[in-house]
UniProtKB/Swiss-Prot annotation:
GO biological process, one term: translation
Highest taxon, organism lineage: Bacteria
Role played: This is one of the proteins that bind and probably mediate the attachment of the 5S RNA into the large ribosomal subunit, where it forms part of the central protuberance. In the 70S ribosome it contacts protein S13 of the 30S subunit (bridge B1b), connecting the 2 subunits; this bridge is implicated in subunit movement. Contacts the P site tRNA; the 5S rRNA and some of its associated proteins might help stabilize positioning of ribosome-bound tRNAs.
NCBIfam families: PRK00010.1
Assembly and interaction partners: Part of the 50S ribosomal subunit; part of the 5S rRNA/L5/L18/L25 subcomplex. Contacts the 5S rRNA and the P site tRNA. Forms a bridge to the 30S subunit in the 70S ribosome.
Gene name of this polypeptide: rplE
Keywords: Ribonucleoprotein, Ribosomal protein, RNA-binding, rRNA-binding, tRNA-binding
Organism field: Rhizobium leguminosarum bv. trifolii (strain WSM2304)
The name this protein goes by in its record: Large ribosomal subunit protein uL5
Family the entry assigns: Belongs to the universal ribosomal protein uL5 family.
Cited PROSITE patterns: RIBOSOMAL_L5
């Protein structure tokens, strides 16, 4: 007997329900024109990296726990004396999620992490870039269940960019609404 291949819940929902809803709403001429999620980029900038060079490594470990994938340590491109930053100094971490990990992260973000954000009133519907990509920020990384609150010595914020194949912001907004993104009214 062949093993059933694992498929994330949101990907299954996209194939079965969301594609049909998008086709009805925008009436695309071709099935390949229906927008889909391309990738999710999570960036964690560590401002305290100038004082302690171990901070980006700790942030990268937390980001690896959240994303389920090893992040890349980002380095300064050039020196800025005002910020006490030298060229090639580690200043943060980032990770790009695609495929099954992307859908799993999106599921945890929308259903678990965002409701745990303090004073959360919804995502800003104007945070689209004009080409169908959505960017948001989270001030505390402890809203994710993968982070043990007792072991955290410092809280970091993170930028989350959801890249879609949509050509306009309206298409991307409709796609993300179908994925249950809680946009502000």
């Amino acid at each position: 007997m062949a093993e059933a291949k694992y498929e994330p819940r949101l990907k299954k929902e996209y194939v079965e329900r969301i594609r049909k809803a998008m086709q009805e709403q925008f009436s695309y001429a071709n099935e390949m024109m229906i927008p889909k999620l391309d990738k999710i980029v999570i960036n964690m900038g560590v401002g305290e990296a100038t004082a302690d060079s171990k901070k980006p490594t700790v942030a990268a470990a937390d980001l690896a726990a959240i994303a389920g994938q090893k992040p890349v340590i980002t380095r300064a491109r050039n020196s800025i004396a005002g910020f006490k930053v030298r060229e090639q100094m580690p200043i943060g971490a980032k990770v790009t999620l695609r495929g099954a990990r992307m859908y799993e992260f999106l599921d945890r973000l929308v259903n678990i992490a965002l409701p745990r954000v303090r004073d959360f009133r919804g995502l800003n519907p104007k945070s689209f870039d004009g080409r169908g990509n959505f960017a948001m920020g989270i001030k505390e990384h402890i809203v994710f269940l993968e982070i043990n609150y007792d072991k955290v010595d410092q809280m970091w914020g993170m930028d989350i960019i959801v890249c879609t194949t949509a050509t306009t912001d309206d298409e991307a907004r409709a796609l993300l609404k179908e994925f249950s993104f809680p946009f502000r009214q």
